[in-house]
Each structure stands twice: as structure tokens, then as C-alpha cells.
Design a protein with these regions (language model features):
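Glycine- and other small-residue-rich loops at beta-strand/loop junctions that grip anionic moieties
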Residues: 48, 70, 75-78, 98-102, ...
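Charged helix-capping and loop-helix junction motifs
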Residues: 49-53, 79-88
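Conserved anion-binding
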Residues: 1-68, 73-74
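C-terminal helical cap(s) of enzyme catalytic domains, especially alpha/beta-barrels
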Residues: 111-152
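Catalytic cores of alpha/beta
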Residues: 12, 84-121
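Hydrophobic faces of well-ordered beta-strands that scaffold small-molecule active sites
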Residues: 2-6, 67-69, 97-101, 119-123
Length: 154
């Protein structure tokens, strides 16, 4: 399976510091005046002309099996995922979406799957620093009625 990873950032809206119209170009997934999130590279430092939601759809059309969508606005903040971004991507394509960027507790995982319509969640810091175990996360989600593969024994 090929996973298309997208690093997305919210774009300035009309009247804010930078206009989306400055980045408009001709490609099938390029930014337009209606774009809410752009695709960024180099850890969110370099902008592209791609609209994140359109790019996810185009990637699916080209054969990607899953989309890994990371909000560069919430990544590392541990304040929760960008649920609006997740819903926009998840609701626009038919392949699985993996949420990334923002998990600070187990409720955030649930929110990304439930409110964000994601199919899976990526979490790093909450596991790296021993705040939760993968087993605890799976149990939390299962207790809330989400279909979860049972934990395997070490």
C-alpha cells in the first residue's frame, strides 16, 4: 500500500496578512480563493501551490491507498488534532485517512476518529514520553465503541 503524506497548514483568508489569490495557478490540485489549507514541505517551512484537500483527492485518484494528513498548525502542540481539516479531507475521499499532529491525550484520539471522521490516528509524544501505552489507547477507544484490533501480548 502506498500512503500519501500531506503536511497541511491553514491559509490566510481574504483581508488577513496574505491573500490566497497570490498562489493561484492552473493544476488540478492547486490553491484557489476557496482553499482553507495549503500543502507545505520541509517541516511546514516551505509553501507549495497545492490545496491540501484537493491534493488528497488527486492522490487518491492516482492510486494512493491511504492519506496521512498532518496539521502543521497543531503538530507537537498536544492540544488536539485539527478536526476541521480532518473532516474536510476524510469527507472528500473514499480511501482511509490517518490523522496526525496534535494528540495530547486519549480523548484527542477519539475526537479525530469520531468528529474528524478519520480512519486511524498517529500519535507520537503521548507514547514516546510514557504518558499512555498503546494498550491503554486501544482500550480507551474500544470502551467508546470504536472497532479496534485487540492489543497483542509482548
Amino acid at each position: 500500500c502506498i500512503v500519501l503524506a500531506i503536511d497541511a497548514k491553514r491559509l490566510a483568508v481574504q483581508g488577513e496578512s496574505e491573500s490566497v489569490d497570490e498562489a493561484v495557478s492552473d493544476g488540478p490540485a492547486n490553491i484557489s480563493s476557496q482553499s482553507r489549507w495549503g500543502v507545505f514541505t520541509h517541516g511546514g517551512r516551505n509553501a507549495t501551490t497545492l490545496d491540501a484537500v484537493k491534493w488528497a483527492g488527486y492522490g487518491a485518484d492516482l492510486g494512493a491507498g491511504e492519506i496521512l494528513i498532518t496539521s502543521m498548525d497543531t503538530d507537537g502542540q498536544k492540544d488536539g488534532y485539527d478536526l476541521e481539516l480532518l473532516r474536510a479531507v476524510s469527507d472528500s475521499i473514499s480511501i482511509p485517512v490517518i490523522a496526525s499532529g496534535g494528540a495530547g491525550n486519549l480523548e484527542h484520539l477519539y475526537d479525530a476518529l469520531n468528529e474528524g471522521h478519520s480512519d486511524a490516528v498517529l500519535a507520537a509524544s503521548i507514547f514516546h514520553f510514557g504518558e499512555y501505552t498503546v494498550t491503554e489507547a486501544k482500550q480507551y477507544l474500544a470502551d467508546r465503541g470504536l472497532p479496534i484490533r485487540p492489543p497483542t501480548s509482548p
